[in-house]
């Protein structure tokens, strides 16, 4: 019985000592994950590539608190996107609507939908076929900044245009 108890004690120590070590793998952020997609996005110097779109045209529009109306800067960014889409007719976009962490999940999903639809309606009114644009709302579920101050909140209040060559 004593040998069984010693054996159990030794195994317990090994298990516990393995749990007390710090993880050596750092936390991976979305930007790190997204950088792996650069291979598929093409060359940033190719004006017909998704990488060019993201870097030079701009893929996001920011919004004021509790607003879904586009300001002039947002309209200008969307006009640049529309020009790129007119030159690259094989691509479609999915506009993701996002919100900051304040408010309920339901409210922020609805606000994200209004933001995505605002960008979509602007794009369609300027000549992009509605069949080339889909919208989705993530509300506050996918923040790009994780802190509780206005700088972070403002980056999370956005509509992001994700370019795709897949059929809807």
Label each PLM-derived region with a short phrase.
Residues 151-155:
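A generic structural micro-feature
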Residues 90-98, 113-144, 157-168:
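A non-catalytic structural micro-motif
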Residues 20-92, 166-168:
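Periplasmic peptidoglycan-binding/tethering modules of Gram-negative envelope proteins
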Residues 3-10:
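Sec-dependent signal peptide recognition
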Residues 73, 77-80, 106, 114, ...:
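Extracytoplasmic/secreted proteins, especially bacterial periplasmic and envelope-associated proteins
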Residues 146-149:
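Short beta-alpha junctions and helix-cap segments that line functional grooves
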Residues 15-18:
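C-terminal motif of bacterial Sec signal peptides marking the signal peptidase cleavage site
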